[in-house]
A protein has these predicted regions:
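Activation segment
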Residues: 75, 127, 232, 240-242, ...
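A glycine-centered beta->alpha junction motif in the catalytic cores
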Residues: 75, 119-132, 175-181, 296-312
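Conserved NTP-binding catalytic cores of kinases and kinase-like/nucleotidyltransferase enzymes
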Residues: 2-105, 229, 341-343
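ATP-binding pocket architecture of kinase catalytic cores
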Residues: 62-157
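ATP/Mg2+ or Mg2+-diphosphate-binding catalytic cores
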Residues: 16, 20, 180-181, 298-343
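A cross-family kinase active-site recognition segment
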Residues: 131-189, 211-213, 312-316
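Active-site acidic catalytic loop and adjacent metal/ATP-binding pocket
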Residues: 51-70, 103, 199-249, 253
Length: 343
């Protein structure tokens, strides 16, 4: 019988004790409300946990004012300087009337601390998921992403990471292999297939050549875009980093190759109203998808002692989970050798 992965054995290895000692176990409703009082936000006692795993995010109701959203940052993930760089980038976008949700300032500060937790407060913005199958929606998103990138190209991040093969591919792969996350009978298979996949990523980066990099949203998928009758607004710049422009475009595309090419044409039609796009970056689309797949598995593994993760990802670490990841990477190896998407 194949051995279970680390996630599958967690309960028998003192998992519950680790959960109880996780820093977020101390983030009680009282701590949240007390923290907000320190920056002049007086809640009426009602909190709604919103769908965030990396951080803890709450909608907070107030007696006589509209609700706000409070984000409590994951301890030890970002330095203060990195968070403030994110805030400054979003503020610069907002100043140019680009539809983003910037943190509120209290006495000139957007990053606050209480009881060992750093947090920021945002205005609440409603909206629905964008309809990415509609050409006009894709063009609209393309126009605003070009404006975000135009601002992103003006300056550089000094304290936030670069999207590269080492940090998004090699390091996550090494973590999974070195920390006993793979079932014994799949470990060598995953090691071989993931190595092949990252070799394919390197070849794709070589084909793209010396592409430009800039400050990005970094995680621009449909869940981080809220749509209203007035159009989109972009939320959650928590993964903002330096990288190629196409990183903020490819996650808006879905379906088979023909559907992705059609979607790309609509995105670029809007994008190029405001900014040129380097077509060499299209060599990176499947390479970036491959890096995201490897990174995502390690992201879950590294946070498994956070009680939100086993609850949200109960299938993580099972035999079937790793078999599916191996199959995905094999498919990516083939896709990375195909010609880039046509525009």
């Amino acid at each position: 019988m194949p051995s279970l992965s680390r996630a599958g054995r967690s309960k028998s290895r003192g998992y519950n004790a680790r959960v109880e000692s996780h820093p977020y176990a101390r983030l009680t409703p009282d701590v949240v409300l007390d923290a907000l009082e320190t920056v002049g936000v007086r809640g009426d006692g009602r909190l709604l946990a919103l769908g965030s795993y990396e951080n803890r995010v709450y909608q907070v109701w107030r007696d006589d004012e509209p609700p706000v959203v409070a984000k409590f940052y994951r301890p030890e993930r970002w330095s203060d300087a990195a968070i403030l760089e994110e805030h400054a980038f979003v503020a610069a976008l907002a100043e140019r009337e680009i539809p983003v949700v910037a943190p509120l300032s209290h006495h000139g500060r957007s990053l606050h601390e209480h009881a060992g937790f750093r947090f920021a407060v945002y205005p609440r913005r409603g909206g629905r998921a964008p309809e990415l199958d509609r050409p006009q929606v894709l063009e609209w998103l393309g126009r605003f992403l070009a404006r975000i990138h135009a601002v992103g190209a003006v300056d550089r991040f000094a304290h936030r990471p670069v999207l590269d093969i080492g940090s998004f591919g090699d390091a996550p792969r090494a973590y999974l292999l070195e920390h006993d996350w793979l079932p014994a009978d799949l470990r060598e298979v995953y090691a071989g297939v993931s190595a092949q996949a990252l070799d394919g990523v390197r070849r794709a980066f070589e084909r793209a050549g010396a592409f430009a990099t800039l400050r990005l949203h970094g995680d621009c998928h449909a869940g981080n875009v809220l749509w209203t009758d007035d159009g989109p607004h972009f939320v959650d710049f928590d993964d903002a980093r330096t990288g190629p422009a196409v990183q903020d475009l490819w996650m808006l595309l879905s379906g088979d190759r023909a559907a992705m090419e059609a979607g790309l044409r609509h995105v670029l039609r809007g994008y190029e109203d405001f900014r040129d796009f380097d077509p060499r970056e299209l060599h990176l689309v499947e390479a970036l998808r491959t890096l995201r797949l490897v990174h995502y598995a390690a992201w879950i593994a590294e946070r498994w002692d956070d009680p939100a993760f086993p609850a949200a990802f109960p299938w993580f670490g099972t035999q079937r989970y790793w078999q599916d990841r191996i199959l995905e990477l094999r498919e990516q190896i083939a896709l990375m050798d195909e010609p880039p998407l046509a525009t």
